[in-house]
Swiss-Prot record:
It is a multi-pass membrane protein. Its EC number is 7.1.1.-. It catalyses: a quinone + NADH + 5 H(+)(in) = a quinol + NAD(+) + 4 H(+)(out). Keywords: Cell membrane, Membrane, NAD, Quinone, Translocase, Transmembrane, Transmembrane helix, Transport. It is found in: Cell membrane. The keyword Membrane applies. Its main location: membrane. This is NADH-quinone oxidoreductase subunit K 1.
Length: 99
């Protein structure tokens, strides 16, 4: 398959994720859409890496996955804390949390 097709797929996935972040109000769905956007960026990095014949994009994608794993841990902890205190996972309730 042509690497340009992977770039089209990455653009489509990123657009779906960005639309989900802008439209949805549930924190878990927004969080999943952000992860979809990160995976679309990883796909673009790997496609550009394959297109140019070097490993730089694949290394960046690997480190992005490591950072995304840490983000999942912190993000889900915040969402669980929000749900326990407000009994809702709405993004609008996040502004009511105390520091």
């Amino acid at each position: 398959m042509n690497p340009v097709n992977y770039l089209y797929l990455a653009a489509l996935l990123f657009t779906i994720g960005a639309t989900g972040v802008l439209i949805r109000r549930n924190a878990i769905v927004v969080f999943m859409c952000v992860e979809l956007m990160l995976n679309a960026c990883n796909l673009a990095f790997v496609a550009f890496s394959r297109l140019h014949g070097n490993l730089d994009g694949q290394i960046i994608a690997f480190f992005t996955m490591v950072v995304a794993a840490a983000e999942v841990v912190v993000g889900l902890a915040i969402i669980v804390s929000l749900f326990r205190s407000r009994h809702s996972a709405s993004v609008d309730d996040a502004s009511l949390m105390k520091l």
